[in-house]
Amino acid sequence: MDSFGRAPPLWPQSALPRVPGAAPSSSGLPWSRVGEIAIFTFVAVLALYLLWSWVGRDLLLVLKARRGGTTEELTFGPRERHSLPAVAVARVENPPCPSGSVEARPFTG
């Protein structure tokens, strides 16, 4: 009775399910890390776009207006600006009012 205290196995060892001790290691980046990088890149591009559309354009308009340029039409790049000739504004004299010949009566009609 050499095997005192040891019971014989009920099933053979090959029939038992094998449970791995640890998950196999992958050689590249895990998919969760790739997803994090993709989401971070998307959020960063969206943030830069919103920053430009909300803040950057308005800041450019303010700086252009402070330099004395027009904010109606911005030109980018090396374009030649043609200045418009100065138009002389003639002062128009108001015609004189009729002198007392017309009697003003409001709300009559």
UniProtKB/Swiss-Prot annotation:
Cellular localization per UniProt: Host membrane
Annotated GO CC locations: host cell membrane; membrane
Membrane spanning residue stretches: 34-54
Predominant subcellular localization, coarse grouping: host cell
Keywords of this entry: Host membrane, Membrane, Transmembrane, Transmembrane helix, Transport, Viral movement protein
Pfam families: Gemini_mov
Disordered, as annotated region: 1-28
Membrane topology value: Single-pass membrane protein
Any one biological process term the GO annotation gives: transport of virus in host, cell to cell
Task of the protein: Involved in the viral transport within, and between cells.
Subunit structure: Interacts with the capsid protein (CP). Part of a MP-CP-viral DNA complex.
Sequence similarity: Belongs to the mastrevirus movement protein family.
Stated name of the protein: Movement protein
Species the sequence originates in: Sugarcane streak virus (isolate South Africa)
